[in-house]
């Protein structure tokens, strides 16, 4: 199924938190996770821990059309270093994108590639600053398999969130995006009101194990560590819709 990606702040924030947590053990790695529709390259999402100005300049100028890294990745399935001949020896003129990189002290980098069934290109690029280029590249080179799997898991999480949001939006009269099913929202709502799992089970007429099952799904969707984090994130991002008290039901 083809998924239309948009820049939803909540989903971007969820994936960025996931990437930040997974990459923490590797030190101060600067990254950019980019998703581009290969049939419509103007549709692009960028999630990065680099300065927001860099991301905005890149996106507003549609630099994905001239970025040699992206143009190389379109025809690759394996990860590559930016100083490979494929990138540096390009005969095309990419002065604008290279000038932007120099402004932010980016001298080299490494990109992991994924082509998904929806005809999207997903890349996870690590940008190396001049004073630490060799050190950072060694970290990436020594962990290539893990970082490739991180791209796969992050992209799977992203597509799952968009798919769930699209499904719930189509099944609802409301046009507001919602990534939670009705049951998940009910459970999250009562949990956010301070109810225990046992109390929620009584309110909704279901078992405690069913409550835990749905909470587990919510934790996976949001890419957080535990239920408390999921509830807090749901409240902070206004993702939980109010529900009316109901009689016990099967």
Curated annotation (Swiss-Prot):
Membrane spanning residue stretches: none
Keyword NAD carried by entry: no
DNA-binding region: 197-216
Pfam families: Autoind_bind, GerE
Keywords for this protein: Activator, DNA-binding, Quorum sensing, Transcription, Transcription regulation
An annotated Gene Ontology molecular function: DNA binding
Domain of life, per lineage: Bacteria
Keyword Transcription: yes
Example of a GO biological process term: regulation of DNA-templated transcription
PROSITE patterns to which the protein is assigned, alphabetical: HTH_LUXR_1 (PS00622), HTH_LUXR_2 (PS50043)
Domain HTH luxR-type span(s) in chain numbering: 173-238
Function: Functions as a potential ohlL-responsive transcriptional regulator.
Assigned protein family: Belongs to the autoinducer-regulated transcriptional regulatory protein family.
Record protein name field: Transcriptional activator protein EchR
Natural source organism: Dickeya chrysanthemi (Pectobacterium chrysanthemi)
Lineage, highest ranks first: Bacteria, Pseudomonadati, Pseudomonadota, Gammaproteobacteria, Enterobacterales
